[in-house]
Amino acid sequence: MKVFKFGGASIETVERARYIAELINDYRDEKVLIVISAKGKTTNALEKIVDAFYAHNISEAQQLFAALEADHQLYADQLLGKRSDALSNKLTELCTEVEWVLSEQHDRPYAYYYDQIVSIGELLSTSIMAAYLNQIGIAAEWIDVRDIMKTDDTYRDANIQWNKTESLAKTVFEKAFKQYNLVITQGYIGSTDDNTSVTLGREGSDYSAAVFANILDVESVTIWKDVPSLLNADPKLFPNTVPIEEITFHEVIEMAYYGAQVIHPKTIKPLQNKDIPLYVKCFLDKNLKGTLIHNTTKAIQYPPIMVLKTNQILLQVNTRDYSFITEDNLSKIYTLFHACKIKINMIQNAAISFVACIDSNPERFDELLAALEKEYDVKRNEHLFLFTVRHYTQNILDEELRNRSILLEQKTRQTIQMVVQ
């Protein structure tokens, strides 16, 4: 058995959805669990509906949702030629869930309403794709993942209840695979014990695919993207990127830790634990080799892997009485960062000072600054960049740092980090 995950970009247009169907058809004789995200731009549209609803602009929220529902109906008609009664009823049934929410007087936290509304995106897209596959003769079963993925009620970042999810996944999926080779479900969403919808947070669709791969002991996972492979840098920021054909789970986690927009570490863990290889391939050209991510002991020669984080703040915290920055002071400072939910990207301490590079987040930063200034003198530089290079060479540093001023630098055998302006 394999697991495929398709992101929203892969089905954003009717043309792409048809191409994805052709790709899936190549695997119709194999057992494949297919995890599909919301159609491209749908989640952003749903977030606007949540914002309008929570701001008490109920009429605006209802109008925006009516437009989104009409968009999906049109998409389905264009894809299928004409919607079947079964699909029309399914879409109406799903949309009614959100309409009920939008008719309520809200008295719960924003995150609760976010999950009830945003979760509809994956359900609509998968319903349409499953109907289309069956219409063109590719038999596929549609499953509501909320009947399987059980979580706590941490809305927008729910924690999976592994034992319940494992039991349900094995029961439901194994029953489906006895009748079908292809099973379609959703990523990113789940439900609590009382069947309240939740979302799984950042990279939730990839994570869903990895969780089910772990539970079902599949042979591989493939994430289909609109890029040819993993690259050594963001092509929007670095013009001369090169593909990475093979990489270890450990190296991907290192890349993600330093801020690379690759596979999230929480997606890697369930796969690494079961030694399940992960492929990143291009849905625009299925014949491209892509990238293999796996456990291996062989030496891999990597190109310099570069990450540039923008909008950084360099914060210097000094003791007022010239006392040393010892474990006691460090503990106090770390506690304040944790309380303000601020992640430190790079740190360095000297005798009487502590320096940290952090993402700019005005609301949280102001809270942190106020707390620090009660006991310490604080200086800051803003609008900076954090430049990280794994497997660096002097040539690449000379090329990329031309006309840059380095404010802080740390270097190990394989990694160099610099705060620059």
Regions from the language model: what does each represent?
Residues 136, 274, 340:
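Conserved dinucleotide-binding and phosphotransfer motif residues
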Residues 1-263, 268:
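Nucleotide/pyrophosphate-binding catalytic subdomain
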Residues 289-421:
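A conserved regulatory-domain signal marking ACT and ACT-like small-molecule sensing domains
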Residues 8-9, 39-40, 189-190, 205, ...:
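Short, glycine-/Ser/Thr-/acidic-enriched flexible segments
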Residues 175-192, 255-280, 315-330, 381-400:
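Electropositive, surface-exposed helix/loop patches at the edges of structured domains
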